[in-house]
Curated annotation (Swiss-Prot):
Record-level GO BP terms: glycerol catabolic process
Coiled coil: none
Oligomeric and partner information: Composed of a catalytic GlpA/B dimer and of membrane bound GlpC.
HAMAP family assigned to the protein according to its UniProt record, in alphabetical order: Glycerol3P_GlpB
Presence of keyword Oxidoreductase: yes
Name the UniProt record assigns to this protein: Anaerobic glycerol-3-phosphate dehydrogenase subunit B
Length: 438
């Protein structure tokens, strides 16, 4: 029999934030993760709110949250005060800074815009050190996209053409630098076979790294913004980027590419290392299969694939299993379910109602806001009965569309901390109704 204070199910950003917050509070914590999370496919920036659920553009996300409880009471942000969301994000900044991964926001706490791999602009709130935070004015003489010979996951010509169409960049010269990484030929059998991890390994070698520096300095100046794919990582990406900046004296902008995203991997590795450093127990490569309940709606234990018939007990459980991509939600032809416990869902009954007629619709597809139904304490229900010691956070929640709104990171971090605080309140025998909104 295994006993913990808090058991966290899911190893994405919500799961690690919940587990870290519990560890900080002195709770004996275990995190069960199936393996690589959606962070391997993420931009590495933390979006808080780029649009309201009705589609209105947001510049100041915390101000926009104030109206959500009246207009969209089902939204996860409506169950927390804006200041709690803000404090949660700064808590994440502190955690990652301790692991050598600083994140930065604007001084006025408004959104900034990052240049995407497609040459578009996307609103976000926290970005990594080598992400150019665009507001409106462009201080660079030229923007130069770096094309790596043999690298298939970044198309600078497409990005360049799209960025030229944006009004903020129409006065800028936008060009391209073609570079070759020594050693690539030995790794590929086809003309365009290299992935970011392959190039990251090569750039650890001084010859390859110095060659890249020389090629960049040959074409770029200090007046330019050099836009390059995220090809430095594998544990020391920021160290190499800092070295690249020192040797070239250039202003660099990293863009995430097709998976694996080295920017996202940096965040996952930093959170995992911090959790283990703080004394957390990580069951990686394991899967929670089911749970046992008592008559009052308490989850008494969970079973995992690797533990077999050994139950895992906790005072409180945090479900951070993710959405469709992470299999926290599963869709069949006629229904959408939460597969571990079979929790009550918010979802339209007929498949025809799951989507809009047009794929590229101006409004959000309904299925993206489907998820587990929770009360003001982020507690789900099972067959109509409230689960007394199970709390949900992150993209398993219903009531919001993280893609349409650009709110995935903010919801994940803030609901993770809210779930843990409410779980600890339960353990400390607080009244369930004592405080519904932190």
């Amino acid at each position: 029999m295994l006993n913990y204070d808090i058991a966290v199910i899911g190893g994405g950003i919500a799961g690690y934030c919940a587990a870290l917050n519990a560890i900080e509070a002195g709770k004996k914590t275990v995190l069960i993760s199936q393996g690589q999370s959606a962070l391997h496919f993420s931009s590495g920036s933390i979006d808080v709110m780029a649009k309201t659920p009705s589609g209105e553009r947001v510049e100041a996300p915390f101000s926009a949250m104030a109206s959500l409880p009246q207009q969209h009471p089902e939204h996860p942000y409506s169950k927390m005060l804006p200041n709690f969301v803000r404090q949660s994000l700064y808590w994440l900044v502190d955690q990652l800074k301790e692991q050598g991964l600083p994140l930065h926001c604007q001084q006025d706490e408004s959104n900034h815009y990052r240049i995407t791999p497609l040459g578009t602009l996307k609103a976000t709130w926290l970005s990594q050190p080598f992400v150019y935070q665009h507001r409106q004015n462009v201080a660079f003489k030229r923007l130069l996209f770096v094309a790596v010979d043999g690298y298939r996951d970044f198309q600078p010509l497409l990005a360049k053409d799209n960025l030229k169409k944006h009004p903020d960049f129409q006065h800028c010269e936008i060009g391209e630098i073609q570079v070759t990484i020594p050693g690539c030929e030995a790794l590929r059998r086809n003309p365009n076979e290299l992935r970011s991890i392959d190039i990251a390994r090569l750039l650890k070698q001084p010859q390859a790294f110095n060659s890249l520096c020389h090629q960049l300095m040959k074409h770029a100046t200090q007046e330019d913004l050099v836009i390059m794919p995220a090809i430095m990582g594998n544990g020391d990406g920021l160290v190499l980027l800092q070295q690249l900046r020192r040797q070239t004296n250039l202003t660099l902008h990293e863009v995430p590419t097709m998976p694996p995203s080295l920017l996202g991997i940096r965040i996952e590795e930093a959170l995992q290392k911090r959790f283990l450093k703080q004394g957390g127990v990580l069951l990686k490569g394991d899967q929670v299969l089911s749970g046992e309940w008592d008559e009052q709606g308490h989850l008494t234990s969970i079973s995992t694939r690797n533990l077999g018939d050994i139950p895992l007990h906790a005072q409180a459980y945090i479900l951070a299993s993710g959405s469709y991509f992470s299999q926290g939600l599963k869709a069949s032809l006629d229904k959408i379910v939460e597969p571990i416990f079979g929790l009550d869902m918010v979802a339209k009954p007929h498949r025809r109602q799951w989507r809009n007629d047009q794929f590229f619709s101006a409004s959000a597809h309904p299925f993206m806001a489907f998820g587990v139904e929770t009360d003001a304490m982020f507690r789900p229900s099972l067959n109509g009965q409230v689960c007394q010691n199970l709390y949900c956070c992150g993209s398993v929640l219903s009531g919001y569309d993280p893609v349409f709104e650009g709110s995935g990171g903010g919801v994940a971090v803030s609901t993770a901390l809210a779930a843990v605080q409410r779980a600890m309140g339960l353990k400390q025998a607080m009244s369930v109704e004592e405080e519904c909104v932190l």
